UniProtKB/Swiss-Prot annotation:
Residue ranges, compositional bias (Basic and acidic residues): 1-10
Domain of life: Eukaryota
Post-translational modification: May be phosphorylated on Tyr-500 by csk-1.
Cofactor(s) required for function per UniProt: Mg(2+); Mn(2+)
CDD domains: PTKc_Frk_like, SH2_Src_Src42, SH3_Src_like
The name this protein goes by in its record: Tyrosine protein-kinase src-2
Reported function: Non-receptor tyrosine-protein kinase which may play a role in larval and pharynx development. Unlike src-1, does not play a role in embryonic development.
GO molecular function list: ATP binding; metal ion binding; non-membrane spanning protein tyrosine kinase activity; signaling receptor binding
GO biological process: cell differentiation; cell surface receptor protein tyrosine kinase signaling pathway; nematode pharynx development
InterPro entries: Kinase-like_dom_sf, Non-receptor_tyrosine_kinases, Prot_kinase_dom, Protein_kinase_ATP_BS, Ser-Thr/Tyr_kinase_cat_dom, SH2, SH2_dom_sf, SH3-like_dom_sf
Active site: 358
Amino acid sequence: MGSCIGKEDPPPGATSPVHTSSTLGRESLPSHPRIPSIGPIAASSSGNTIDKNQNISQSANFVALFQYDARTDDDLSFKKDDILEILNDTQGDWWFARHKATGRTGYIPSNYVAREKSIESQPWYFGKMRRIDAEKCLLHTLNEHGAFLVRDSESRQHDLSLSVRENDSVKHYRIRQLDHGGYFIARRRPFATLHDLIAHYQREADGLCVNLGAPCAKSEAPQTTTFTYDDQWEVDRRSVRLIRQIGAGQFGEVWEGRWNVNVPVAVKKLKAGTADPTDFLAEAQIMKKLRHPKLLSLYAVCTRDEPILIVTELMQENLLTFLQRRGRQCQMPQLVEISAQVAAGMAYLEEMNFIHRDLAARNILINNSLSVKIADFGLARILMKENEYEARTGARFPIKWTAPEAANYNRFTTKSDVWSFGILLTEIVTFGRLPYPGMTNAEVLQQVDAGYRMPCPAGCPVTLYDIMQQCWRSDPDKRPTFETLQWKLEDLFNLDSSEYKEASINF
């Protein structure tokens, strides 16, 4: 994969833009305090994003970046590219707007729109994005040779980066700003506006690896900060309709449903007596505040009557089912990428000092674009209130995924989650095989205490198995952090293809 941004400026006489092969970095993302003009019409003057904490002094036109379907009667539905007039932005992350074409008014999520003709409104602008994430986006099957995006530079605060797909690799170029205004990739070819620069390289490569083609596809709409503008955690269960059962587990059933008639949701229906409603509501309030692209969004609960209902966003299927049904269609880099996404979500929980306690493929959800989200984080602590004997015998306890200090002494920490993550990695590379095949829970406890670890699965790269072994160190303090696991797996995503080809023979 192409790119190493941050090299020296091209010399004044350079005849082509400078790009290099990729060295994936993990630098922190800098702020981008100003937006360049993209054409004859000036972009937003307030910075990279509109200040949502102030009134927009005059009504302003914004363009929809994604489709949004109203979730309540007070919301406003719109489609991508619709023009919306913002009337009031004092409601935090939900703004009151008028649809220019229909005249209808209602609340909209502010992160679904951008000021008309600003850089953020352009389909090729992706804002703050790491190089490795740009590469993953561009190499997605939705994109073809020549697909491109513009993002904020990781290493230079006021610069931008152009990322371009060339066949099955990605090249990166720095877009620099001139002191007197204007932009360039090669000094010999400056442009008055960013729009002019993009248009030029769409017409001809002129030193780039390829002519710019279609903007990179944005496959997912962003999460809204809350489910609705007037966010209610406890909702009337009459507003939740169950359509069909899509799963079941030790604590209850999972249903596809609708909230407020037309909003698709998943509904976890807990078995009666599973949890005390007061305790559950207190814990669920904490869980609801956890927001990350790789965590399943919790929308609402119904706790006033049995059974307790948990309303969440709807995903297509759980990872275990996906692996068993379609996992063999994936190449090793895709399996590693799935693992890295889980590590990213767990790194956020780690940062928030929140323990999952039941990390396994059955509790990871996935869609057709191979984007995953972690589910059921924290539920185990609320729901697993069994006696000590029942827990240790594994009646309602996932022994094969549980770290020895947690299974034996009930010591659950982020490091016990790391152990479980190592077990999850075996599920991923074996397409959903049960861990410790042929062994009972009691045998697993005994053998793991004696130092036994699962051998390297067939077809698994040695470097990936080494990560598993690090997760299974007896001393919890010597296990890696999820932040470390994330970048290790992201580096594996860029592993020499020869190892993947060799590993793929067993598929």
